[in-house]
C-alpha cells in the first residue's frame, strides 16, 4: 500500500517547501524505500513554459519533455530520480481535463463543480502517480500558501485522500515562518499558530510542523507551538538557513524527522545510510580553490531564472575542489566598448538559454570577447546559437548574420526554424522538448568531456543551426562536434584553436547531480581553473 505525504506552506511563499520535501525524500530513499514526488501548482497556466522567468524562475524540463516548476529540479537533484509529466500538476491542466471530459459527455449531463469534479481529478493525479511508479511513498508539495483562494480545491482534495485511503496511510507536513523581530529581539510564533488554525479550519491537522527561522528555536518555543497546534514538541522541526542547501537532509535527520514520518505511517525501515551525503556536504564546506564564472543573461536580477545552471556549475566545482563565484552579468549592459572591463576578472564565460531579441548584442559581444581572448566559453541553447552567429559575422565576414528568431529578414539565417516548427501557431508545449540522443565526433573536446560518442540530453528549443552554413563554418575552424544520430541536427559546436570553447543546443544543466556533475560543466570549470 502506497503511503501519502502532503507538504503545505503557510505565512509566506518561497519558504522552502520544495527543499523540505526533497530532503525528506532523500532520507526515505536512503532508508531503502522507493519514493516519488510531485508538485501541485495552483496557477491557471497549463504549465510554466510560456511564463516569464521573472514570474516563475526557470522552466525545468523532464526526460519526457514536460515544462515544469523549478522545484522538480530540487527533487531530481536531491533524490537522484528522473521525474515525468505526471510530477507537475497545475490548475490549468486539471480544468482543461475536466472541461474536455464534460464536452465528451463523461459526466452524463450532470452539473460540473469544483467538488467533486475538480477535486476528484486532483486526487486522480495523486493516485495515478502512485500506480505508475508503484512507490512505497509519494510526496506531494502543494504550491502557494494556505489561505490563498487558488489553493482551496487542492487542500480539499488532499483532505479527502485521508478518508479515501485511511489515516494511517497519510501524513501532513506544514511549513511556516517564525519571524525574528530585530527591534524587540524576539521570535514570534503567532503567524505559525494562525496558519495552522487556517489549515485546521479546512479539515487538515498537520502531523509535523517545519518552522523556517534565522535563529535557533528554543525548547520553550517548540512546546508553545506544540500546545497551540495540537502536536508533540518533537514534531516541531527547526529549519534554519544553511551554508549549503545540501545540509538540510542531515539537519532533518538529526531531528529524527524521518523516524517521526515512518512512525506515523506505520512503516519499518533501516536507518538511513548517509555517509556519502555527509562526505558531499563536508567537501562543499571545505573547498580550497575559487573560480569566477561570468554568467551573461538578461534575467540575472532574478537568479532563480538560471537555477539549474548555477547548481550545475557548483556541482562541477565540488568535483574540482573549487568554490564557484558567479558574476551575474546583465547582457543589456554589455557592449563592445565595455566588455573587456566587465570581463576582466572572470575565469570563464557562460551564456545560458533564453528567448527573444532583448539584450542579444550584449551576449554576442561577450562571446566575441571569449573567442578572441581565449577565455573558456560555454554556450547553452541560445548561447550556442549566438556563438555560431558571432563566428559567422566576425570570422566568416557574413554581414548581418543572425538568427531568424531575432531577425526574420536576415540575409544570413545562421539559425532557423526546425522544418517541423514552421506551421505551428501555439507557443505553449510546442518546442522540441525532452531527452534526445546525440552522436559525438571522436577526437573533440566534447568527446573528451563525455568519454563516449553517444549521449542523451534534454532539449528545449524551436530554432536550430542552418546546415547551409555548416561547411563554411567547419572550414574556418568551428567544428560540429555532435549531431543528432541521423546527422541532421547540430547539437554541439567547438573551436579548434581555442583552449575551451564549447557550445551545445541542449540543456545539460538538467541532468547534473551534486554527487555526479554533468560532463561538459565539469570540463568547463576545469578549463576556467586552468585560466586563472
Curated annotation (Swiss-Prot):
Domain of life of the organism encoding this protein: Bacteria
Keyword Transcription: no
EC category name: ligase
Control of this protein's activity: Allosterically activated by GTP, when glutamine is the substrate; GTP has no effect on the reaction when ammonia is the substrate. The allosteric effector GTP functions by stabilizing the protein conformation that binds the tetrahedral intermediate(s) formed during glutamine hydrolysis. Inhibited by the product CTP, via allosteric rather than competitive inhibition.
Residue ranges constituting the Glutamine amidotransferase type-1 domain according to the UniProt record: 292-532
Binding site for CTP: 13, 148-150, 188-193, 224
Family annotation (PROSITE patterns): GATASE_TYPE_1
Annotated pathway: Pyrimidine metabolism; CTP biosynthesis via de novo pathway; CTP from UDP: step 2/2
Residues the record lists as binding ATP: 14-19, 71
UniProt key word Ligase: yes
Note: CTPSs have evolved a hybrid strategy for distinguishing between UTP and CTP. The overlapping regions of the product feedback inhibitory and substrate sites recognize a common feature in both compounds, the triphosphate moiety. To differentiate isosteric substrate and product pyrimidine rings, an additional pocket far from the expected kinase/ligase catalytic site, specifically recognizes the cytosine and ribose portions of the product inhibitor.
Subunit structure: Homotetramer.
Similarity section: Belongs to the CTP synthase family.
HAMAP family, per the entry: PyrG (MF_01227)
Protein name, as recorded: CTP synthase
Top-level taxonomy: Bacteria, Bacillati, Bacillota, Bacilli, Bacillales
Amino acid at each position: 500500500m502506497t503511503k501519502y505525504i502532503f507538504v503545505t506552506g503557510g505565512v509566506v511563499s518561497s519558504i522552502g517547501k520544495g527543499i523540505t520535501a526533497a530532503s525528506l525524500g532523500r532520507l526515505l530513499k536512503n532508508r531503502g524505500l522507493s519514493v516519488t514526488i510531485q508538485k501541485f501548482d495552483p496557477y491557471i497556466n497549463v504549465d510554466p513554459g510560456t511564463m516569464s522567468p521573472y514570474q516563475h524562475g526557470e522552466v525545468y524540463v523532464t526526460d519526457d519533455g514536460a515544462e515544469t516548476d523549478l522545484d522538480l529540479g530540487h527533487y531530481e537533484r536531491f533524490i537522484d530520480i528522473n521525474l515525468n509529466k505526471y510530477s507537475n500538476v497545475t490548475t490549468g491542466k486539471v480544468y482543461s481535463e475536466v472541461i474536455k471530459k464534460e464536452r465528451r459527455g463523461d459526466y452524463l449531463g450532470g452539473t460540473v463543480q469544483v467538488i467533486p469534479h475538480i477535486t476528484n481529478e486532483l486526487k486522480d493525479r495523486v493516485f495515478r502517480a502512485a500506480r505508475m511508479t508503484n512507490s512505497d511513498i509519494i510526496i506531494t508539495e502543494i504550491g502557494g500558501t494556505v489561505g490563498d483562494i487558488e489553493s482551496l480545491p487542492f487542500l480539499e482534495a488532499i483532505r479527502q485522500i485521508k478518508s479515501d485511503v485511511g489515516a494511517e496511510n497519510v501524513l501532513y507536513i506544514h511549513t511556516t515562518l517564525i519571524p525574528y523581530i530585530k527591534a524587540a529581539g524576539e521570535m514570534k510564533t503567532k503567524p505559525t499558530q494562525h496558519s495552522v488554525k487556517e489549515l485546521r479550519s479546512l479539515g487538515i491537522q498537520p502531523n509535523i510542523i517545519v518552522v523556517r527561522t534565522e535563529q535557533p528555536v528554543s525548547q520553550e518555543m517548540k512546546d508553545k507551538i506544540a500546545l497551540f497546534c495540537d502536536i508533540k514538541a518533537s514534531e516541531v522541526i527547526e529549519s534554519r538557513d544553511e551554508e549549503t542547501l545540501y545540509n538540510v537532509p542531515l539537519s532533518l535527520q538529526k531531528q529524527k524527522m524521518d523516524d517521526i514520518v515512518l512512525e506515523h505511517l506505520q512503516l519499518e525501515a533501516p536507518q538511513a545510510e548517509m555517509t556519502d551525503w555527509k562526505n558531499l556536504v563536508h567537501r562543499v564546506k571545505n573547498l580550497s580553490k575559487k573560480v569566477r564564472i561570468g554568467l551573461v543573461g538578461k534575467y540575472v536580477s532574478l537568479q532563480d531564472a538560471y537555477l539549474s545552471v548555477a547548481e550545475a556549475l557548483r556541482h562541477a566545482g565540488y568535483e574540482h575542489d573549487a568554490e564557484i563565484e558567479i558574476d551575474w552579468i546583465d547582457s543589456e549592459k554589455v557592449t563592445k566598448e565595455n566588455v573587456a572591463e566587465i570581463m576582466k576578472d572572470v575565469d570563464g564565460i557562460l551564456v545560458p538559454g533564453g528567448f527573444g531579441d532583448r539584450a542579444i548584442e550584449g551576449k554576442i559581444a561577450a562571446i566575441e570577447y571569449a573567442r578572441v581572448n581565449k577565455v573558456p566559453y560555454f554556450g547553452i541553447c541560445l548561447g550556442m546559437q549566438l556563438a555560431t552567429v558571432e563566428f559567422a559575422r566576425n570570422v566568416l565576414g557574413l554581414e548581418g548574420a543572425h538568427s531568424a528568431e531575432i531577425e526574420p529578414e536576415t540575409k544570413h539565417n545562421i539559425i532557423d526554424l526546425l522544418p517541423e516548427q514552421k506551421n505551428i501557431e501555439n507557443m505553449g508545449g510546442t518546442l522540441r522538448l525532452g531527452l534526445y540522443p546525440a552522436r559525438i565526433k571522436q577526437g573533440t573536446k566534447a568527446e573528451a568531456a563525455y568519454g563516449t560518442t553517444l549521449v542523451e540530453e534534454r532539449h528545449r528549443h524551436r530554432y536550430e543551426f542552418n546546415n547551409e552554413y555548416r561547411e563554411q563554418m567547419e572550414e574556418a575552424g568551428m567544428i560540429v562536434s555532435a549531431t543528432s544520430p541521423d546527422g541532421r541536427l547540430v547539437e554541439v559546436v567547438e573551436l579548434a584553436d581555442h583552449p575551451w570553447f564549447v557550445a551545445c543546443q541542449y540543456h545539460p544543466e538538467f541532468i547534473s547531480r551534486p554527487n555526479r556533475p554533468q560532463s561538459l560543466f565539469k570540463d568547463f570549470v576545469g578549463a576556467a581553473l586552468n585560466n586563472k
